From Swiss-Prot:
GO terms for cellular component: nucleus. PANTHER family: TATA-BOX BINDING PROTEIN. This is TATA-box-binding protein 2. It comes from Entamoeba histolytica (strain ATCC 30459 / HM-1:IMSS / ABRM). General transcription factor that functions at the core of the DNA-binding multiprotein factor TFIID. Binding of TFIID to the TATA box is the initial transcriptional step of the pre-initiation complex (PIC), playing a role in the activation of eukaryotic genes transcribed by RNA polymerase II. The lineage of its organism: Eukaryota, Amoebozoa, Evosea, Archamoebae, Mastigamoebida. Belongs to the TFIID complex together with the TBP-associated factors (TAFs). Binds DNA as monomer. Its main location: nucleus. Disulfide bonds: none annotated. InterPro entries: TBP, TBP_CS, TBP_dom_sf, TBP_eukaryotic. Keywords: DNA-binding, Nucleus, Repeat, Transcription, Transcription regulation. Sequence repeats lie at residues 30-114, 120-201. Belongs to the TBP family.
Length: 212
């Protein structure tokens, strides 16, 4: 959640009125872009974190601030949170495949330091996506219509929080049309959540509401 503010934007080019209307009514014309994948995996061995940061590049360990060591690599760009138990959390990649590649690179680095690792249990814990529906949304009207699923406190946070039951994904919806999706474990769930929310957002399009 801490990285949700770093939302990627998609290029948009103005087209004819006909194509714009077609896009508004077809969620397949846009889709969420993955901006962060969080995964976990195990190395099957206890780790001495001070030893790791002494021998590895781009690694730090301050137990007064955080219980794990932090390591970064540039390709694929990512950050690993390394714990004494041998559990590692990988974050910052833009796809599941990148996350797998990064996790194996971290495992290889620790193996080279001298640990008899056993790489296992790679699991995606969270996929964060973002998109822009290209129209403004009447958040107050939306929350009134879907009160059971929504939380909206504009004095605390400018976005509406929509908790979808199936798939189990949380969406942050902004009046500008920006949408952030979090909690998906696979791309299918991410895209399905967007497909489900799109007609709801379209029904609460600010221009349409104001003309009623």
């Amino acid at each position: 959640m801490s990285q949700l503010g770093n939302i990627c934007h998609a290029d948009y080019m103005s087209t004819s009125t006909e194509s714009q209307e077609r896009s508004l009514n077809n969620p397949n014309d846009t889709h969420p872009e993955i901006v962060n994948v969080v995964s976990t995996f195990q190395l099957g061995v206890k780790l001495e974190l001070r030893k790791i940061v002494q021998k590895a590049r781009n690694a730090e360990y301050n137990p007064k601030r955080f219980a794990g060591a932090i390591m970064r690599i540039s390709s694929p760009k990512s950050t690993a949170l390394i714990f004494q138990t041998g559990k590692i959390v990988c974050t910052g990649t833009r796809s599941i495949e990148e996350s797998k590649i990064a996790s194996k690179k971290y495992a290889k680095i620790i193996k080279k330091i001298g640990y008899p690792i056993h790489y296992s249990n790679f699991n995606v814990q969270n996929i964060v996506g973002s998109c822009d529906v290209k129209f403004q949304i009447a958040l107050r009207t939306l929350v009134d219509s879907y009160l059971a699923f929504c939380q909206y406190e504009p004095e605390v946070f400018p976005g509406l929080v929509y908790r979808m039951a199936s798939p189990k994904v949380t969406l942050l919806v902004f009046s500008t049309g920006k949408v952030v999706l979090t909690g998906a474990k696979d791309e299918e769930s991410l895209n399905l959540a967007y497909k489900n929310i799109y007609p709801i957002l379209l029904a609460n399009r600010k221009e349409d509401i104001s003309n009623q």
